[in-house]
């Protein structure tokens, strides 16, 4: 029996299911979580929760987003599924929900994943967890309709930077073609996720732009935002999305570094690279992880 067969067996057995993802979730985390949530509900699993304590408002248009919970009083779920999460520690405040579940599953695409579930379906060659989820849902023979497809597309668009990051393959576009056939509006979704910004997000991005510094003969770009910036511009979770990519888009830059201050939690460092530097290995040295 394959790993996916075993996971689907656990899904069928479970009376209660919780879907979790990493803190400070991006579009791949939110989109893939909601795709699974919607697919399981459509399949007839009624007792399913998706918990995302701080979901960026950018993704409020996604089907099922109104059902996202900030917390849950359920102590012991039959099945916990961690999505787009490379390690147990990345679950942060939700780690106990995962740990206390009868059975745990991990669905992910990070090469640094430490296989922390009872069952792990991980493909480090996939540029987005949404691609891994498409494979899983197809293996489960669960329907991918327009609504679920929209959630999956958000995941792919986000983690590929609009199809411009390394790791994008012919299969990526084949997956997107399949979603198009389901009626998903690619141009509208792309615009909502990557092009439309709130005024607060625009101001936060402008502040970061004004602080960019270069090192190593212009090969490294660095910028940051502070708690004071968040307060000044009334910025919220998710408003920082895309800032780390600004430096990488500048000619000659190989590595972009973005640091943001998080209230009560210190500093969060994000790294992005072009082809020559594997930044996930650098992040791993400091307890982080991810992909180039």
Q: Residue ranges of each PLM-predicted region?
A:
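Short glycine-rich anion-binding loops that position phosphate/pyrophosphate groups of nucleotides
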Residues: 24-25, 85-88, 110-112, 227-228, ...
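Solvent-exposed alpha-helices and their adjacent loops that cap or buttress functional pockets
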Residues: 72-75, 96-99, 113-114, 144-146, ...
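Short glycine/serine/threonine-rich phosphate/pyrophosphate-binding segments
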Residues: 27-33, 88-91
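A generic local secondary-structure boundary/capping motif
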Residues: 8, 70-71, 93-96, 120-123, ...
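Active-site cofactor/cluster-binding pocket
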Residues: 63-119
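Hydrophobic helix-and-loop "lid/oligomerization" segment in the mid-to-C-terminal part
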Residues: 2-23, 31-60, 70-77, 158-292
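Generic enzyme active-site microenvironment
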Residues: 20, 24, 82, 106-107, ...
């Amino acid at each position: 029996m394959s790993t996916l067969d075993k996971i689907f067996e656990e899904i069928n057995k479970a009376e209660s299911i919780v879907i979790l993802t990493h803190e400070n979730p991006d579009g791949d985390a939110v989109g893939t979580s909601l795709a699974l949530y919607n697919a399981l509900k459509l399949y007839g699993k009624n007792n399913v929760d998706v918990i995302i304590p701080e979901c960026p408002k950018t993704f409020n248009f996604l089907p099922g987003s109104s059902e996202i919970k900030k917390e849950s009083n359920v102590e012991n779920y039959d099945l916990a599924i961690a999505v787009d999460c490379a390690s147990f520690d990345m679950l942060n405040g939700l780690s106990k929900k995962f740990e206390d579940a009868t059975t745990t599953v991990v669905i992910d695409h990070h090469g640094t994943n430490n296989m922390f579930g009872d069952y792990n379906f991980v493909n480090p060659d996939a540029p987005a967890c949404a691609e891994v989820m498409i494979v899983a849902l197809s293996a489960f023979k669960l329907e991918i309709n327009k609504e679920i497809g929209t959630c999956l597309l958000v995941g792919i668009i986000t983690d590929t930077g609009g199809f411009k990051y390394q790791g994008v393959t012919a299969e990526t576009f084949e997956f997107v073609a399949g979603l198009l056939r389901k009626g998903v509006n690619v141009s509208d979704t792309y615009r909502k996720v990557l092009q439309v910004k709130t005024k607060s997000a625009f101001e936060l991005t402008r502040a970061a732009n004004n602080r960019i510094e270069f090192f190593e003969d212009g090969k490294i770009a660095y910028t940051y935002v502070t708690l004071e910036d968040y307060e000044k511009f009334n910025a919220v979770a998710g408003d920082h999305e895309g800032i780390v990519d600004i430096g990488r888009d500048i000619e000659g830059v190989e590595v972009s570094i973005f640091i943001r201050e998080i209230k009560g939690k210190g500093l969060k460092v994000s790294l992005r690279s072009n082809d020559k530097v594997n930044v996930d290995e650098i992040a791993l040295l400091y307890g982080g992880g991810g992909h180039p």
